[in-house]
Amino acid sequence: MDVASAPGVSSHPPYYSKPICSSQSSLIRIPINKGCCFARSSNLITSLHAASRGVTRRTSGVQWCYRSIRFDPFKVNDKNSRTVTVRSDLSGAATPESTYPEPEIKLSSRLRGICFCLVAGVSAIVLIVLMITGHPFVLLFDRYRRKFHHFIAKLWASISIYPFYKTDIQGLENLPSSDTPCVYVSNHQSFLDIYTLLSLGQSYKFISKTGIFVIPVIGWAMSMMGVVPLKRMDPRSQVDCLKRCMELVKKGASVFFFPEGTRSKDGRLGPFKKGAFTIAAKTGVPVVPITLMGTGKIMPTGSEGILNHGDVRVIIHKPIYGSKADLLCDEARNKIAESMNLVS
């Protein structure tokens, strides 16, 4: 086995069907006697530390596995030997069950990512001037929908993505008019989802974590567009976010949710949270499901600095009406899941 070819992090589960001492096992059995003398214990620990210099240990999503919760090699009152199981960088190379190896990033993808950031950054700086200039008039005449700001956002998103990937949009006839308040929901695969959805030109308010609002230019634009802030893992912030969204819908604006709550790391559709559908059920507005495919391959989660080649497909489903949040949630998720399965 070539040690130099071992990947950095192993992502396989902590238990395997193969014998623990087989040549392909990634678990190393180290028998240690708790009743050994101090000198033998010190020599053993010193040997282990010396061996660890050649093989880097890293956290791989699970904790180290011990047969005993507490282990002290210097205690002499217990003569029972026990086994310590450790995980190393060699595990990813030796175990065929490793499912998510680190992908090799091509130089062209890195260059495309740099160009994408430059185009998006320069266009944002230019267009933010128009948004700031028109903001007082937007507050006076269109305080809730803010169509002018969303037009600027559509222009910015289109300029940013047009040179790098094509977007195939299906079901444009299912989009309600911009004056009709709706609750839009979609699967979430990549940072590019925001750009793709903004390019549709609909005036909807996204939900975004508060940390993004402090970013210059981008945070200013989000505030002027009326993006709703949310502190993750804060119950009070979640309640305030839902109240704010319900108020916007009652005033005639539309809101956009990613019901999964976060980006999918493997492209699979996760479970939906019911907050968006509760708003739709209480206000009586329709739910418009949207399926996004391809963004996760072009810019994977955790690799926002690269941009692979590929195309994006957007499927806009027919609006769903209902008065029960559970039924709305199940129907919207089923529509998105069916379209993803048909394409894949």
UniProtKB/Swiss-Prot annotation:
Family annotation (InterPro entries): AGP_acyltrans, Plipid/glycerol_acylTrfase
Listed EC numbers: 2.3.1.51, 2.3.1.n4
Keyword check for Signal: no
One record GO biological process: phosphatidic acid biosynthetic process
Catalytic activity: a fatty acyl-[ACP] + a 1-acyl-sn-glycero-3-phosphate = a 1,2-diacyl-sn-glycero-3-phosphate + holo-[ACP]; a 1-acyl-sn-glycero-3-phosphate + an acyl-CoA = a 1,2-diacyl-sn-glycero-3-phosphate + CoA
Its membrane topology: Multi-pass membrane protein
Sequence similarity: Belongs to the 1-acyl-sn-glycerol-3-phosphate acyltransferase family.
NCBIfam families per record: AGP_acyltrn
Location of this chain's protein in the cell: Plastid, Chloroplast membrane
Domain free text: The HXXXXD motif is essential for acyltransferase activity and may constitute the binding site for the phosphate moiety of the glycerol-3-phosphate.
Main enzyme class: transferase
SUPFAM superfamilies, per database record: Glycerol-3-phosphate (1)-acyltransferase
One Gene Ontology MF term: 1-acylglycerol-3-phosphate O-acyltransferase activity
Tissue specificity field: Widely expressed.
Presequence positions on this chain: 1-49
Function: Plastidial enzyme of the prokaryotic glycerol-3-phosphate pathway that converts lysophosphatidic acid (LPA) into phosphatidic acid by incorporating an acyl moiety at position sn-2. Utilizes palmitoyl-ACP (16:0-ACP) to produce phosphatidic acid containing a saturated group at position sn-2, which is characteristic of lipids synthesized by the prokaryotic pathway. In vitro, can use 16:0-CoA as acyl donor.
Keyword Oxidoreductase: no
Transmembrane segments annotated in the record for this chain: 113-133, 210-230
Biological or metabolic pathway of the protein: Phospholipid metabolism; CDP-diacylglycerol biosynthesis; CDP-diacylglycerol from sn-glycerol 3-phosphate: step 2/3
Keywords: Acyltransferase, Chloroplast, Lipid biosynthesis, Lipid metabolism, Membrane, Phospholipid biosynthesis, Phospholipid metabolism, Plastid, Transferase, Transit peptide, Transmembrane, Transmembrane helix
Protein name stated in the entry: 1-acyl-sn-glycerol-3-phosphate acyltransferase BAT2, chloroplastic
Motif HXXXXD motif location, chain numbering: 188-193
GO cellular component: chloroplast membrane
